[in-house]
């Protein structure tokens, strides 16, 4: 029996206990998870009657009151980068209809060196703009509002001393059959530990590409990019 902590980004840090053996694909052993327990929030303010820990004051500190999906990757040492998708500022209200509030950003970036997750994930810092608010890293709807809806990170990885994040640039969320449409997908890179980012325009995937969304993996000195279509 082992215990591990995982993150459900934008919502809670969870603790999992159980038989967590994972073998090769042709093995009969599988990953088994039980006893899932919510520990803390990662971003945002507590809800009325909320008893979860909330170690990060992301609302007043960074104007991050609500976030979309999140992803994390190992940078160096104990340092982890965390990209969040669509992010709302002051005035955000939790509801089933999506984002609201002020200061919409398509994505924001946080950093953590916390290795003890039993009391929640603590954010050390976020990438900030001149006003001290979490900065939109990958250009979203505000740069081309007639065409761009938003730019959502799908996966990130460090290669040598370069950090890379794959994004999908959304054209329409309301396509038929629950799908969404992209203008393109691309990669942004940073060579200064996440302080500045630039888009690699030569790495661009078309709207019908099977690399509209990806997951990165490392093995034997190679980096693999596993892709799928948008929506």
Language model regions located:
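Active-site cradle of extracellular carbohydrate-active enzymes
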Residues: 217-231
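Asp-box/BNR beta-propeller loop motif
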Residues: 190-198
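Repeated scaffold domains used in trafficking and secretory/extracellular systems
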Residues: 154, 207-215
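Short, solvent-exposed loop/turn segments at conserved positions within beta-propeller repeat blades
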Residues: 176-183
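Short loop/turn motifs that cap or connect beta-strands within the blades
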Residues: 202-205
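N-terminal regions that are enriched for targeting/export leaders
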Residues: 26-169, 181
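Bacterial Sec-dependent N-terminal signal peptides
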Residues: 1-27
């Amino acid at each position: 029996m082992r215990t591990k902590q995982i993150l459900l980004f934008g919502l809670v840090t969870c603790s999992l206990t159980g038989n967590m053996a994972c073998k090769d694909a042709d093995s009969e052993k599988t990953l088994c998870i039980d006893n899932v327990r919510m520990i803390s929030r990662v971003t945002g303010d507590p809800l009325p009657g909320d008893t979860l820990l909330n170690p990060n004051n992301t609302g007043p500190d960074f104007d991050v009151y609500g976030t979309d999906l999140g992803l994390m990757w190992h940078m160096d040492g104990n340092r982890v980068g965390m990209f969040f998708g669509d992010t709302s500022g002051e005035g955000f209200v939790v509801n089933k209809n999506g984002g609201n509030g002020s200061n919409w950003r398509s994505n924001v970036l946080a950093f953590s060196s916390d290795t003890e997750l039993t009391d929640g994930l603590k954010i050390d810092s976020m990438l900030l703009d001149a006003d001290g608010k979490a900065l939109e890293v990958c250009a979203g709807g505000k740069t081309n509002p007639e065409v761009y809806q938003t730019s959502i990170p799908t996966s990130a990885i460090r290669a040598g001393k370069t950090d890379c994040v794959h994004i999908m640039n959304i054209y329409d969320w309301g396509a038929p059959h629950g799908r969404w449409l992209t203008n393109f997908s691309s990669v942004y890179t940073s060579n200064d530990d996440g302080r500045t980012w630039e888009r690699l325009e030569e790495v661009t995937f078309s709207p019908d590409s099977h690399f509209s969304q990806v997951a990165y993996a490392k093995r034997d000195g190679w980096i693999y990019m596993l892709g799928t279509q948008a929506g």
